[in-house]
Amino acid sequence: ETEQSDITVAQAYLQIVLARCIGKLNLVEKSNVGSNDLIYQTVSYISANFKKKFSLEEMAKDLGVSKYVLSRLFSQIFHRNFNQYLNDARLNYACYRLENTRDSITNICLDSGFESQRTFNRTFKERYKISPSDYRSRTLS
């Protein structure tokens, strides 16, 4: 009998604790969870694939969303379009390689996902206002 009453008291205390905890929880609407999940998937996808050639359409297909949803995500969350975000990932990697290796600029350019050195040089100069070779010289000195 005392064992049963101990269980009843324990259950009552547990219900009080749970009731207090529920009030502290931050509940999130399902639509926001999905959106955050897509943001995570987008960042992960680009991090894993920026060295390859791929389009917004291919990425959207792989993630199971329309290219319009993905395009809007880039605009609203990242405040840049798909190509700008992808080039940022590629440029960040290229800068790391320029600063930390003696690899040729051509190899760095191609390994970073750029299709040509001309595109790489133009994109790099637009972003950093300096050529990749000058950037390397300044960071290594």
What residue ranges belong to the model's regions?
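Sigma70-family region 2
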Residues: 23-28, 51, 75-76
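A ubiquitous short alpha-helical element
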Residues: 30, 57-58
